[in-house]
Amino acid sequence: MGIRSTSVSDAVAALDERSREIFRRIVEGYLESGEPLGSRNLSRLLPMSLSPASVRNVMSDLEDLGLIYSPHISAGRLPTQIGLRFFVDAFMQVGDLSAEDRASIDRQVRAESGGNPVESMMNEASRMLSGISRGAGLVITSKSDPVLKHVEFIRLEPTKALAVLVGDHDQVENRIIELPAGVTSSQLAEAANFLNAHMSGQTLPELRKQLSQLKDNVRHELDALSRDLVERGIAVWAGSPDEGKPAQLIIRGRANLLEGLAGAEDLDRLRLLFDDLEKKDSLIEILNLAETGSGVRIFIGSENKLFSLSGSSLIVAPYRDDDDRIVGAVGVIGPTRLNYSRIVPMVDYTAQLVSRLSRNPL
């Protein structure tokens, strides 16, 4: 029975010492060079004495388990995607980052090139992750919530008005609202003045939290029509629970993905990957993948339906805001032969660092 029908632990238990060692050498050789390893070379690398014929017998058993395969006749063996998952779960050792590595990541991520310090930090994080991997570094940032600066209602027709919200960096959001029957221009102005007095300096999520308190104030300060108008304005600006979904993908190191392409088939897979990364739904899906675990998630090839056609691997971890809510993700995407044991702790540390720095910008 192959590994497809058994758990990883069952498969590990079924392998003896020499099978484990041969499998480990095949995977490590693939991760290092991308090239298949043959029985003759393997017999020279092994710590135990085994003839090429004995190595071939073990390789045949590993192939039956679905852990390795031969890319073409008379070639060595490469790990399958199932074999890579098996290796990552059962063999890979992820150590702690050295103080030097942590200092290097801190220095690169904190490197500020002017402008918005948070945006600079995200760009540097993406660039740094690209530099330490053979893939592309990515950062998904959540939609920022503007601090409210000014509110205005502009009548469009008797039953409709344009609700205008101006943020602290002069970003403008316009929403059309239905007007209560009989509302006057003076009541529009009165409602806007009330909101400017009570909402200025807050973000939309903060406004949402204070909705009930504002309603109490409205009852004391405004007439019925103005109260209705204020509540409609608050409701339309507060938006939906999905308002904070990711809005931007920062990706660096796309050129890394061009290295080692073997032909038209590899180029087609890369094109599919780039197409996937341009889709808004893909960003949401990546963030959803990051949210499903407590730390770093590893998706190899077809395990992740998002990039299954391109055969890419994704290593991703979420970062959080002051309220411990997941607001974005950092990671690396690239070929399946990424250096997982080195990249995983770096993605993990980078996510923690971005969480800290986004709460307290540079």
UniProtKB/Swiss-Prot annotation:
A Pfam match: HrcA
Entry's Gene Ontology molecular function annotations: DNA binding
The keyword Repressor is annotated on this UniProt entry: yes
Residue ranges the record marks as coiled coil: none
UniProt entry tagged with the keyword Transcription: yes
Any Gene Ontology biological process: negative regulation of DNA-templated transcription
Domain of life: Bacteria
Keywords, in A-Z order: Repressor, Stress response, Transcription, Transcription regulation
Similarity field: Belongs to the HrcA family.
UniProt function note: Negative regulator of class I heat shock genes (grpE-dnaK-dnaJ and groELS operons). Prevents heat-shock induction of these operons.
Name assigned to this protein: Heat-inducible transcription repressor HrcA
Biological classification of the source: Bacteria, Pseudomonadati, Pseudomonadota, Alphaproteobacteria, Hyphomicrobiales
